[in-house]
Amino acid sequence: MQAQQSTVDPSEIAKFEAMAAEWWDPNGKFKPLHMLNPCRLDYITSQIAGEFDRDLKTDAPFAGLRILDIGCGGGLLSEPMARLGAEVVGADAAEGNLPVARIHAEQSGLEIDYRHTTAEAMAEAGEQFDVVLNMEVVEHVADPLSYLTATQQLLKSGGLQICSTINRNPKSYAMAIFGAEVVMRWLPRGTHEWSKFITPDELFALLEQAGLNPVDRKGFVFNPILWKWSISDRDLSVNYVTASTKS
């Protein structure tokens, strides 16, 4: 069998390597993710609970589930999943992120298997998971379809993938690039490339081509007056998230 070619974009990896030490600083370069994280977690936990019939009010509701956090960064999603009882593997192509993630997990008393690897390498090795968290990654890869095919292969039959990214339209450029990188300086300039953003319809089509069954999509909407994020059923104009299952 021919080895799968990695979809990792070296220039994208270099951007995150340069910021690695700041992952757990809520006022640092990853401030946007810290602000967004409660919404991401609300969506992720509700989707997993619904798909696997888990009661979030119980202790360790995700016990027995194997979860992959691909593009895990410093572990902002891996750690909450571990606290909910899941067996968590955090994978990242940016090796500099992982010492930060490992140290923070150890300090937090959590056991998380952090690996410097790619989705393609894990799929080729035959790794299988109940859930794949694919959050804010697809807009940074060189070939989205090949990448999503690899993440599909990592899912067990009946598994669930949560995938979030950024829409491509004038509003997303104004907010995610000009607003976040130029005006607010939440992120270094060049963190995102507008041409790599993906519309919800494009992402649904890619997920289907990759062998997944898209079942839900929601928007993450920032309110500059309340200075907080919320989940929207209708507004997918900038940040949005999807849920897909594997038959």
UniProtKB/Swiss-Prot annotation:
Enzyme type, top EC level: transferase
Pathway as given in its UniProt record: Cofactor biosynthesis; ubiquinone biosynthesis
Positions annotated to bind S-adenosyl-L-methionine: R40, G71, D92, M135
Signal peptide extent: none
Gene3D superfamilies: Vaccinia Virus protein VP39
Pfam families in alphabetical order: Methyltransf_23
Name of the protein in its database record: Ubiquinone biosynthesis O-methyltransferase
Keyword Cell inner membrane: no
EC number: 2.1.1.222, 2.1.1.64
NCBIfam families: UbiG
Naturally occurring in which organism (per UniProt): Ruegeria sp. (strain TM1040) (Silicibacter sp.)
Keywords, alphabetical: Methyltransferase, S-adenosyl-L-methionine, Transferase, Ubiquinone biosynthesis
